[in-house]
């Protein structure tokens, strides 16, 4: 008898077959259970200490998972889910994780006890996905993007589950205002639908300033910089400034390579210094030729240049971030110039109404405000402490993402678990028409969809068993808009209760959840390399 050949490294752990699948499903469930209490308006907060000793207080699914350190590969893939959801649509991160975990949990018995091949389960899940998206489409309704009241209600539904609910009115205004500001009309698409570009990441800047009250926050029709003018004598208040944006240093240009100069006479030395000064003077004269009243550069400004520009009646800001400079260009209509020699009259921005420097707390901030038709903006957030501001910032990002999604595809689904319940009831009906073993995993998706309304009831402290059967009965009669009031844990009609969510978010969360479940079911071998213990 030949000795067994060991080809795997002994220090590696390896799980195969059923064992691997069970371990994956357990890990996915564990992640889902951590997040489960963070769904709905009565959500709990999680308090996390990151390795640096910083504190994170949040109930945003994505923010929590980002901070948790996970070892299991399946759990890591769950974290990726919430990230995808966050980048794609910005909201619904918690829903995705709970759904994916629940679908896997519902499929587990068929996989382990009934020994159904994973591929058959996956086929059924894919079929369920197509049908589920169909149902979501049926229960959704179009929305008028220009109707501010309706839009605010919508954003409120997204914010309602977050920490900022105390100031939800204010936050809705901020988010809607900001998104409307950066909305850029690109004409019409091929199908003749309106086409917008809304880039929140690049053109909406959130400046968090501790102190003051949250209600003091506002959207600036312009840009706010944490800078002061470079010279104390420069004007700190300019109405209708003429803005010049530069991407070059205003100091003496040194050659790229090293140069040696031999000096014979003493006057030559003075001449060299003079040339340096003349060069700086020439640069400043070229700038002042277009009569600017505000010069902003991404690089440094030498003392001499400050002196000349001050004499020319010009305020200067230096070392501004590239991203900020782009925003200033969008709001003032100026063009960023890389060489002073190339400055033209058309590069000067005149759309800004007011430049002023204010002291907030103990720092100076420069405002470029009251711009005409700005295509970028800054949200100035005030609040008690840094932790509160960070949480408000996260929630505001979600709210803006919601507003953006609706503008890009104006269609709404009922919230409060109503959409999920409708999908669940419809899938359960269809499962009865399927033949063979496929109907079990198909039914599993239907059962899994119920976990969203169930979790909402549990988080609000209601009785899940009684309420769920009532809800199921309502949906079976065709009331698709019936869902859970997450505050009181009662059954309400979403039309009168007024909680609607963008259809994109619902579709994306179902897609992501089912596809990730399929992915994890396909795995039948996990090899984790263990580092050699020192």
UniProtKB/Swiss-Prot annotation:
Alphabetical list of InterPro entries matching this protein: Chap_CCT_gamma, Chaperone_TCP-1, Chaperonin_TCP-1_CS, Cpn60/GroEL/TCP-1, GroEL-like_apical_dom_sf, GROEL-like_equatorial_sf, TCP-1-like_intermed_sf, TCP-1_chaperonin
Modification sites for N-acetylmethionine: 1
Gene Ontology BP terms: chaperone mediated protein folding independent of cofactor; protein folding
S-S bonds: 371-377
Modified residues (Phosphoserine): 257
Coiled coil ranges: none
UniProt-recorded Gene Ontology molecular function terms: ATP binding; ATP hydrolysis activity; ATP-dependent protein folding chaperone; unfolded protein binding
Compartment(s): Cytoplasm
GO cellular component: chaperonin-containing T-complex
Keywords: Acetylation, ATP-binding, Chaperone, Cytoplasm, Disulfide bond, Nucleotide-binding, Phosphoprotein
CDD domains with a match to the protein in the record: TCP1_gamma
PANTHER family, alphabetized: CHAPERONIN (PTHR11353)
The protein's assembly and partners: Heterooligomeric complex of about 850 to 900 kDa that forms two stacked rings, 12 to 16 nm in diameter.
Annotated family: Belongs to the TCP-1 chaperonin family.
NCBIfam families on file: chap_CCT_gamma, thermosome_alpha, thermosome_beta
Entry function: Molecular chaperone; assists the folding of proteins upon ATP hydrolysis. Known to play a role, in vitro, in the folding of actin and tubulin. In yeast may play a role in mitotic spindle formation.
Protein name listed in UniProt: T-complex protein 1 subunit gamma
Organism this protein belongs to: Saccharomyces cerevisiae (strain ATCC 204508 / S288c) (Baker's yeast)
Highest classification ranks of the organism: Eukaryota, Fungi, Dikarya, Ascomycota, Saccharomycotina
